[in-house]
């Protein structure tokens, strides 16, 4: 029977320009129909960012910075998000030209992503376990077929359905008093491929690490319609 949701853990590696690849731990909750929580933690500096969809909308939470932004967004409907297994399945369904090969108990799909115009990453290779029919890994490539994002699924549990109360954003912020800043942007494309949220006409231009009360914090600077 169809479950009411899932929980999964994965690792994600992003290969940027010339630097070292960045490694992240990813944890996803999904409860049908529309509750999502994605937690992404950078392994080197332990900075965590969350994107949460609940009844009130879509929120991006950076617990350590005590910041929560609310978006007007259809996320994740419009996006290929490789760590959301429902979206991954949708990618495969929508790409009529997807090619499947079979090898060593695995199905390997070569398929298009659905938001290449925004990301510049048009294709992906999805490896599915033949027995469980669950994805084992996803590699997302640029137009030169160079690997840019690699996701390895460590554990996928289809029997977990978190209660909707568990998706309350207040739970994830380190300070109960926090106010939610509304990012009043009609957001066409909320992407959570860390380093951060990128929305229309806004891009991450700077990332500073500052020492504050002995704590290391990452300050993200945006440029665009809204500057924070």
Feature locations, PLM:
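Short, solvent-exposed coil/turn segments at beta-strand boundaries
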Residues: 2-5, 29-36, 52-57, 104, ...
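An acidic-aromatic
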Residues: 27-82, 142-152
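Short, surface-exposed charged micro-motifs
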Residues: 27, 48-50, 97-99, 123-127, ...
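Short, solvent-exposed recognition patches
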Residues: 27, 175-228
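N-terminal leader/targeting segments and the immediate start of mature chains
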Residues: 1-35, 45, 93-102, 178-184, ...
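Gly/Pro-enriched, hydrophobic low-complexity segments
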Residues: 102-174
């Amino acid at each position: 029977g169809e479950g009411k949701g899932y929980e999964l853990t994965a690792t994600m590696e992003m290969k940027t320009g010339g630097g070292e690849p960045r490694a992240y731990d990813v944890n996803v909750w999904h409860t049908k129909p529309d509750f999502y929580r994605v937690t992404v933690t950078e392994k080197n500096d332990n900075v965590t960012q969350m994107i949460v969809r609940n009844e009130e909308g879509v929120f991006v939470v950076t617990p350590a910075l005590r910041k929560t932004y609310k978006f007007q967004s259809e996320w994740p409907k419009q996006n290929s998000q490789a760590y959301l297994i429902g979206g991954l399945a949708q990618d495969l369904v929508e790409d009529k030209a997807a090619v499947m090969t079979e090898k060593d108990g695995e199905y390997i799909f070569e398929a298009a992503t659905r938001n290449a115009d925004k990301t510049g990453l048009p294709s992906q290779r999805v490896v599915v376990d033949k027995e469980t029919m669950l994805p084992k890994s996803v590699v997302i490539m640029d137009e030169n077929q160079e690997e840019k994002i690699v996701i390895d699924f460590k554990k996928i549990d289809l029997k977990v359905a978190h209660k909707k109360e568990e998706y309350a954003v207040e739970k994830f912020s380190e300070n109960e008093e926090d106010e939610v800043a509304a990012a009043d942007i009609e957001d066409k494309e909320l992407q959570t491929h860390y380093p951060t949220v990128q929305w229309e006409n806004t891009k991450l231009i700077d990332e500073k690490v500052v020492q504050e009360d002995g704590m290391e914090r990452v300050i993200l600077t945006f440029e665009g319609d809204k500057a924070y």
